[in-house]
Amino acid sequence: MIAFIVLLSLAAVLQQSSGTVDFASESSNKGENQKQIVKKHNALRRSVKPPARNMLQMEWNSRAAQNAKRWAERCSFTHSPPSLRTVGKLRCGENLLQSSQPLPWSKVVQAWYDENKNFVYGIGAKPPGSVVGHYTQVVWYKSRLLGCASVKCSPTKYLYVCQYCPAGNIIGSQATPYKSGPRCADCPSACVKGLCTNPCKREDDYSNCKSLAEKNKCMEEWMKSKCPASCFCHNKII
């Protein structure tokens, strides 16, 4: 989801209150900026309310960053097609922001997160129809790989793109982007400052794999092939 009018208005307010920033200095090609982008995301994921029991810690992914850069350079100001948002077998989500002036990455990520003012856990957007998809992607529990890029499309148009793998905003689950509960309750032995560090790196092909696994279907070969996460990722965040 994207709503440039809302995000542009917010970006303009943030820019006016924070002064100018050198666009080149915020390049996501720089290692220190990559670390800051990841740090900002993890800080926000750690601070969700209600707290999350299964929120994975994010890390930078160069392939996702390359995909984000290639798309940003097109200056199309629309979401990239899913076929251009993959890292290995993972399908990735995407957040965009357009600004009339350059912004520090911390402000960009915060702008996405601030949609939480119109989000109620377990209910979703409130009032109904409010734009909250950028927020829910930032805090989607399973999105653990992150790559971002920005481009100056014109003197008054700057585009910021982040891709998240695996993708969030799964249809039917947007109101619960994570499981609420005590921080790290689902990963007590793999927790760093409230974030889980034990992701399952396998992906199920079907949405009902978990229920099938609970019925001891993992003894069957087709199940092992189509539901590897549910069958093999014990004590991991799936």
From Swiss-Prot:
Taxonomically, the superkingdom here is Eukaryota
Organ and tissue specificity: Expressed by the venom gland.
Here the disulfide bonds are 75-153, 92-165, 148-162, 184-191, 187-196, 200-233, 209-227, 218-231
User: Any keyword Signal?
Assistant: yes
Any one cellular-component term (Gene Ontology) = extracellular region
Assigned keywords, A-Z: Disulfide bond, Ion channel impairing toxin, Neurotoxin, Secreted, Signal, Toxin
Give the propeptide segment as residue ranges. Answer: 20-27
A single GO molecular function term of this UniProt record:
toxin activity
Q: Where is the SCP domain?
A: 39-164
- Short name of one Pfam family for this protein? CAP
Q: Which residues form the signal peptide?
A: 1-19
The family database entries (InterPro entries) matched by this protein are listed as:
Allrgn_V5/Tpx1_CS (IPR018244), CAP_dom (IPR014044), CAP_sf (IPR035940), Crisp-like_dom (IPR042076), CRISP-related (IPR001283), Cysteine_rich_secretory (IPR013871), SCP_CRISP (IPR034117), ShKT_dom (IPR003582)
User: Could you tell me what this protein does?
Assistant: Blocks olfactory (CNGA2) and retinal (CNGA1) cyclic nucleotide-gated (CNG) ion channel currents. Does not inhibit retinal (CNGA3) currents. It forms high-affinity contacts with the pore turret region and most likely inhibits CNG channel current by blocking the external entrance to the transmembrane pore. Does not affect neither depolarization- nor caffeine-induced contraction arterial smooth muscle.
Q: Which family does it belong to?
A: Belongs to the CRISP family.
Q: Which PANTHER family match?
A: CYSTEINE-RICH SECRETORY PROTEIN-RELATED (PTHR10334)
What protein name is recorded for this chain? Cysteine-rich venom protein
